[in-house]
């Protein structure tokens, strides 16, 4: 897959880059994408939901009245779930929602997501951006030059860069990640992927070695 490399003004530089077909040209596997997204979203859940049972709520454990002879129903004590303030029956308990996935499954899911972006022509390769200081306005201007001002974008860089990351994180709808931390959910959630030139050159190696979903 061959793409033009654009400069920060949104113009073609006259250079192109070849993205590997074994990643961007595969037939996407929807099921592994589903599994990877489910794993990602499950890992975001805290899972600490909890209600008290009749054994845990505060209150007397004394039986309210004798079992028989009153003409009323048998009740037990005040912690009975039938009473206000009583324990809960079958309420939520702490639970982990994350699931385990093999590395090969996660890699296939990531490549499938990239293949979808390639089919949608939603990948832009941008020449490397060097910023001396964090400047949100500067990066927002770059997006406008690329006609991506109102789109959700995922910016992929080869390694962490303080100035670039701080510049893009305050732009609405823009998410930044280093190539080794890229995951299936972020790829699919973005309308367009912006690869810096250096990241694009490392892409085939890093995706094959990555472990995140």
Residue ranges and their predicted role:
Residues 32-68:
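A short, flexible low-complexity segment enriched in Lys/Arg and Gly/Pro that occurs
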Residues 1-46, 92-213:
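Extended polybasic, low-complexity segments that bind anionic RNA or targeting/receptor surfaces
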Residues 54-90:
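Glycine/serine-rich anion-binding loops at beta->alpha junctions
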């Amino acid at each position: 897959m061959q793409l033009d490399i654009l400069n920060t003004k949104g113009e073609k530089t006259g250079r192109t880059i070849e993205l590997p077909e074994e990643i961007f040209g595969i037939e996407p596997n929807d099921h592994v994408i589903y599994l990877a997204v489910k794993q990602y979203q499950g890992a975001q859940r805290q899972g600490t939901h909890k209600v008290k049972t009749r054994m845990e709520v505060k209150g007397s454990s004394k039986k309210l009245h004798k079992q028989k002879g009153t003409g009323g129903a048998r009740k037990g004590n005040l912690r009975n779930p039938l009473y206000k303030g009583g324990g809960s029956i079958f309420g939520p308990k702490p639970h982990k929602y994350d699931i385990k996935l093999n590395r090969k499954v996660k890699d296939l899911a990531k490549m499938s997501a990239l293949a979808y972006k390639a089919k949608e022509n939603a990948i832009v390769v941008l020449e490397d951006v060097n910023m001396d200081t964090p400047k949100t306005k500067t990066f927002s201007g770059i997006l406008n030059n690329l006609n991506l001002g109102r789109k959700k974008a995922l910016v992929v860089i080869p390694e962490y860069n303080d100035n670039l990351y701080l510049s893009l994180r305050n732009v609405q709808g823009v998410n930044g990640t280093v190539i080794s931390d890229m995951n299936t959910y972020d790829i699919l959630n973005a309308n367009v992927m912006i690869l810096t030139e250096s990241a694009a050159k490392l892409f085939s190696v890093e995706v094959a070695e990555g472990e995140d979903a």
